Regions:
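A polyanion-binding, active-site-adjacent surface
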Residues: 1-111
Length: 111
């Protein structure tokens, strides 16, 4: 079991500092970190390309202590795409001119 809150804390902290705020109208909750999303980037629904290129976040990600060979943690070097993250952040990018405009209304978190 991976806990990206432990090994991917640096990008998660950037995400929280930049985008978490009071007074949003909606909260979108994920129920587990995807293997090619939050497990790689520390960001909820963290599809690598969209986290890096649209949200403007990138930071070092460590390897978990008990890394599984079939689910390696590559951080922002991961070339696989998280489908749910691509859909969520892709929709946000289509609807909002900037990430800041999106996060004025909604926050995304993983339970």
């Amino acid at each position: 079991v991976y806990n990206p809150l432990d090994y991917a804390r640096a990008p998660l902290e950037l995400y929280l500092k930049r985008y978490a705020r009071r007074g949003v109208k909606g909260l979108l909750l994920g129920m587990n970190p995807g293997p090619y999303g939050m497990a790689q980037t520390g960001v909820p629904f963290g599809e690598v390309a969209l986290v890096r290129d649209w949200l403007g976040l990138e930071a070092p990600v460590a390897r978990p202590a008990n890394e599984h060979p079939k689910r390696p943690i590559e951080g922002f070097a991961c070339t696989r795409s998280e489908v749910s993250g691509a859909r969520l952040w892709g929709l946000a990018r289509e609807r909002c001119p900037t990430p800041g405009a999106f996060f004025e209304q909604v926050f995304v978190w993983n339970y």
